[in-house]
């Protein structure tokens, strides 16, 4: 399964249903060398070239259920709907 958010396509997707955390990464998570947090509180990971390679979304399903989408600033605000992350949150 892949999930595309903005201009990044994440091919390493894991949803931890027990804690409602969605982990997204491009390839191997160990390529991340720099870390930041979006204004919404999502963890952002970047490679040595400054390219976004990972996003961790806490309360992913809760946000979709409550807001209908997940807002992520990367640096532009991207709105991610259930059509994008729904399969991952359903464990498909």
For every predicted segment, state its role.
Residues 1-22:
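Short, compositionally biased leader-like segments
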Residues 1-8, 31-37, 80:
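Short, solvent-exposed secondary-structure boundary motifs
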Residues 10-13, 44, 69:
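Phosphate/ribose-recognition catalytic cores of enzymes acting on nucleotide-derived substrates
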Residues 15, 43-44, 88-91:
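Peripheral terminal and inter-domain segments
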Residues 19, 25, 31, 91-92:
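N-terminal intrinsically disordered, cationic/polar leader segments
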Residues 25-62:
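Amphipathic, hydrophobic secondary-structure cores in small proteins
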Residues 62-75:
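A short, polar/charged loop-to-alpha-helix boundary motif
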Residues 78-92:
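Cysteine/selenocysteine-centered motifs that mediate thiol-based redox chemistry or coordinate metal-sulfur cofactors
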């Amino acid at each position: 399964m892949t999930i595309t958010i903005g201009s990044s396509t994440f091919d390493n997707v894991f949803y931890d249903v027990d804690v409602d955390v969605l982990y997204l990464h491009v390839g191997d998570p160990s390529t991340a060398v720099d870390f930041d947090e979006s204004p919404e509180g999502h963890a952002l990971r970047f490679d040595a070239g400054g390219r976004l390679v990972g996003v961790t979304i806490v309360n992913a399903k809760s946000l979709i259920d409550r807001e209908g989408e997940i807002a992520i600033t990367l640096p532009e605000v991207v709105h991610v709907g259930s059509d994008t992350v729904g399969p991952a949150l359903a464990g498909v």
